């Protein structure tokens, strides 16, 4: 399977060419960039242009971009208006969210990538038909804007009442949106289970997020290394291999003291090898 690393691993550090060089030197051929403004400020043309110049001269490929979740650089702590959700029921506010996501998509004009990973709502959000109507309108506009730039929008299963595997499939069936999925294995472990989520989503999976947790907390633990993870990785990999070639093995990990940066990148390479051989 193709190996991809999400820059979520060092999302609290500003993304620069030094980090990208280290990823390439670790033997990872492609990345997903996590769009958080303290990490990648999609409004900062200087940062985007610097990275674009580096990518044009590098073998490292930009596989995907994780859509922004907040408009600030402090994980939404500046206030509720900084939270970006396409389920926002107030049209004027939702249009601002769509505009912010479009700003991130503009990166494709400088650094081409295949996929934008998009959340449907926020963590722990309750189900409401009106929220899905809001999301439908937003996704129509975002998808059109993305396609004009050669990008496909993928919906990710996240731990809320709108984005279980079953709800995502139902949403696409009802709206007839021609979208596919990013299967987040860690999030599935917190909801219906990895096997169930995979079975429901498998025909539309185009990318993955691989990480572990205790079934309750979205802690982005390191598979096979971190203590407290509850995913059966031999079984999970057996499932994922049935669709090999349809999607990559994409690690979305968190920085932990036991895996200090940048040395942790060497462990990333070993982790890919372990997952492929279990």
Go through the PLM ranges and name each one.
Residues 32, 64, 117, 154, ...:
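Conserved beta-strand positions in the central sheet of alpha/beta enzyme cores
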Residues 58-60, 113-114, 151, 243-248:
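A short helix->loop->beta-strand "cap" motif at the edges of active sites that frequently abuts
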């Amino acid at each position: 399977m193709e190996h991809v690393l999400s820059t979520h691993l060092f999302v609290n550090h500003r993304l620069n060419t030094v980090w990208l060089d280290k990823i390439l030197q670790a033997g990872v051929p492609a990345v997903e960039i996590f769009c958080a403004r303290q990490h990648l400020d999609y409004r900062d043309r200087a940062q985007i242009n610097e990275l674009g110049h580096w990518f044009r001269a590098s073998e490292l490929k930009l596989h995907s971009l994780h859509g922004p979740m907040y408009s600030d650089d402090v994980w939404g702590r500046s206030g509720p208006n900084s939270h970006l959700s396409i389920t926002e029921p107030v049209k004027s506010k939702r249009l601002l969210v769509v505009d912010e996501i479009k700003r991130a998509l503009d990166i494709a004009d400088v650094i081409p990538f295949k996929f934008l990973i998009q959340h449907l709502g926020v963590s722990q959000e309750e189900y409401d038909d009106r929220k899905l109507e809001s999301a439908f309108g937003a996704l129509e506009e975002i998808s059109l804007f993305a396609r004009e730039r050669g990008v496909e929008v993928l919906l990710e299963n996240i731990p809320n009442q709108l984005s279980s595997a079953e709800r995502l499939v139902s949403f696409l069936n009802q709206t007839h949106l021609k979208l596919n999925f990013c299967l987040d294995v860690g999030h599935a472990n917190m909801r219906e289970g990895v096997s169930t989520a995979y079975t429901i989503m498998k025909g539309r999976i185009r990318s993955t997020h691989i990480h572990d947790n205790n079934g309750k907390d979205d802690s982005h633990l390191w598979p096979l290394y971190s203590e407290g993870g509850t995913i059966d990785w031999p079984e999970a990999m057996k499932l994922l291999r049935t669709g090999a070639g349809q999607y990559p093995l994409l690690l979305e990990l968190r920085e932990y003291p036991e895996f200090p940066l940048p040395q942790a990148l060497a462990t990333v390479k070993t982790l890919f090898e372990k997952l492929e051989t279990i």
